[in-house]
Every structure is written in C-alpha cells, then in structure tokens.
C-alpha cells in the first residue's frame, strides 16, 4: 500500500493538507485525485484542499495549491503563511525573510518568531490588478469593474473586481450576517462572465480601519478565511473611497482576524497567524 507523510495546518481555520514534495514526490498525474481524497471529511482527512511544498529554481521553495475539487489554484494567502511557517520550522530556510514561488509569481514572506516557533507571518502579496484581462472577466480587456452593477440572472449586485494573483469579486452589504453565500456564492463563482471562475466576497465596512468579511472560495465553497480575499476586500474598500492607503486595516473573517495594509508602492501586505494541527501518514 502506498502512503505519504503530511502535516495539517490552518490559517484562521482555512485548513489544508501540506505535503513536502522534496521528500514525498507524489506523482504529477495523480495530484488532483489525491487532493480530492485527502480533502474528504468522510474517507480522507478533511480539508479545504492540499498544498505541496516543492523545490524551486528561483526561490527557496515553491507552493502549489489544489482545491478540494481537485482544481489547481494560483495563490492562497493563508496557505502562504502556513508554508512560510513550515519551511522555517523545518529548517528548509534559515532567514526570517525569504521568497516563495507560486503560479502567480514570487512573493516575499517574513516570519515573526517567538521561542523558536513562528506565531505570525507577514506576506507581501504584490500589486493588485483591476483590468478584466487580469481576472479574467468578460468585456474590454483593459477596462475595470469598480462598484458596477452586475447581472447574475436572479439578482443584480454592485461589485468590484480585483485580481490578487487569483480572481475576486467584492460586494458590500450593511449586515455581514445576511451574506447570501449559500445561494449566490456558487452561482457567481461559475457565472459565464468569469471564464475561469471567481472567489466571491461579501464585506461590511465598520470603519476606515475595520471590515467584516465572508467568502465563497472558487473550488472550495464556504471557508473560514481567505487571505487573498481579505486583501481584495481591503483594496476594494480603498478604491471605492471608504478607506485610505498606508493604514492597517483589520479584516474580521469567520476564522479570525488579518491585518491588511495597501502601501503607497502599490504592494499589499497581509499579516496573520499560521498553526500546525497534526502530522500523520495517509494511505492511498
């Protein structure tokens, strides 16, 4: 029977199965299938997906993300924080600031260490993009969608489209508890206007420095947290004139809080926790 070692980790409840591909070398042709297997709460471990920690030619490590439906994602903020914690605590890297390769490009992570353990991680998530071609989204490639009415058949909502290396559409409401994740999340995620799908965020603005946030993730559904989504929500709030750059913005997610800062140099910084749940052996 084939088996591999794994570590289950979470960032604010957004939990993945982490596999060190430098040791395990799971076969490429079976990665999607394995991701579905390990993610199952009935016949697997139970998770939002699987993240591989791989060798890289351009950075100390490369991160690959597989959602619980087997699709491969391009970026994951909570996953990046957990990868940073893993590689530092397993002495794959020794510097406290280092780069991680993703399908969206290189990102820089800084681990905050206390008693030899990483308790917080700051990740430079890069520059947001707003053009439809960056999402991608149907329409004029160079045009943007900022607080524009979008027709989803059963309803029309004003949305702001932001790419943080993966696609996000942000909607605002007055009460986050009324966010229609179950009903509208799957409809919007797979709507024709988003050829590659989209992450769906609902946001309640409390103040210039505080947001409430809920998410329906592309390929995973409702999750406790989404780091790139929190970045998209903060950036969207600023471009919609409800907050300012160079301000620490606390984003309250279902699983806890992230601190987001959109800097004057256009880079978005995300700071939050990363936790190890357990280690184990998975039998295929």
UniProtKB/Swiss-Prot annotation:
Subcellular localization(s) per the UniProt record: Cytoplasm
Catalytic activity: (2S,6S)-2,6-diaminopimelate = meso-2,6-diaminopimelate
Main location per the UniProt record: cytoplasm
Domain of life assignment: Bacteria
Enzyme Commission numbers on file: 5.1.1.7
Database matches in SUPFAM superfamilies: Diaminopimelate epimerase-like (SSF54506)
Membrane-traversing stretches: none
Keywords noted in UniProt: Amino-acid biosynthesis, Cytoplasm, Isomerase, Lysine biosynthesis
Active site: 76, 226
GO MF terms held by the record: diaminopimelate epimerase activity
Name of the top EC class for this enzyme: isomerase
Any single Gene Ontology cellular-component annotation: cytosol
Tagged with keyword Magnesium: no
Biological pathway: Amino-acid biosynthesis; L-lysine biosynthesis via DAP pathway; DL-2,6-diaminopimelate from LL-2,6-diaminopimelate: step 1/1
GO biological process: lysine biosynthetic process via diaminopimelate
SS bond list: none
Feature type site, description Could be important to modulate the pK values of the two catalytic cysteine residues: 168, 217
Residues the record lists as binding substrate: 14, 67, 77-78, 166, 199, 217-218, 227-228
PROSITE patterns xrefs: DAP_EPIMERASE
Family per record: Belongs to the diaminopimelate epimerase family.
Record's function text: Catalyzes the stereoinversion of LL-2,6-diaminopimelate (L,L-DAP) to meso-diaminopimelate (meso-DAP), a precursor of L-lysine and an essential component of the bacterial peptidoglycan.
Assembly with partners or alone: Homodimer.
Name under which the protein is recorded: Diaminopimelate epimerase
Organism: Bacillus pumilus (strain SAFR-032)
């Amino acid at each position: 029977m084939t088996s591999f070692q794994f570590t289950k980790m979470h960032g604010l409840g957004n939990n993945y199965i982490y596999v060190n591909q430098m040791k395990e070398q799971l076969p490429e042709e079976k990665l999607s299938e394995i991701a579905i297997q390990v993610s199952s709460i009935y016949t697997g471990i139970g998770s939002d997906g699987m993240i591989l920690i791989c060798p890289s030619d351009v950075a100390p490590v490369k991160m690959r993300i597989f959602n619980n439906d087997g699709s491969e994602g391009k970026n994951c903020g909570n996953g990046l924080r957990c990868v940073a914690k893993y590689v530092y605590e397993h002495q794959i890297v020794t510097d406290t600031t280092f780069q991680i390769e993703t399908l969206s490009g290189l990102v820089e992570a800084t681990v905050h260490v206390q008693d030899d353990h990483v308790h917080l991680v700051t990740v430079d998530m890069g520059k947001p993009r707003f053009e439809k071609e960056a999402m991608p989204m149907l329409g004029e490639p160079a045009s943007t969608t900022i607080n524009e009415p979008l027709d989803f058949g059963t309803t029309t909502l004003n949305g702001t489209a932001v790419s943080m290396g993966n696609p996000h559409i942000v909607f605002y409401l007055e009460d986050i508890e009324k966010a229609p994740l179950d009903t509208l999340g799957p409809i919007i995620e797979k709507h024709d206007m988003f050829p590659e799908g989209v992450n769906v965020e609902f946001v309640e603005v409390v103040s210039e420095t505080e947001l409430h946030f809920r998410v329906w993730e592309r390929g995973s559904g409702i999750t406790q947290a989404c780091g790139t989504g929190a970045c998209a929500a903060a950036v969207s709030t600023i471009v919609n004139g409800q907050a300012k750059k160079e301000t620490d913005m606390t984003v309250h997610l279902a699983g806890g809080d992230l601190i987001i800062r959109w800097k004057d140099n256009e880079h978005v910084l995300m700071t939050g926790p990363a936790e190890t749940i357990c280690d184990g052996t998975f039998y295929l």
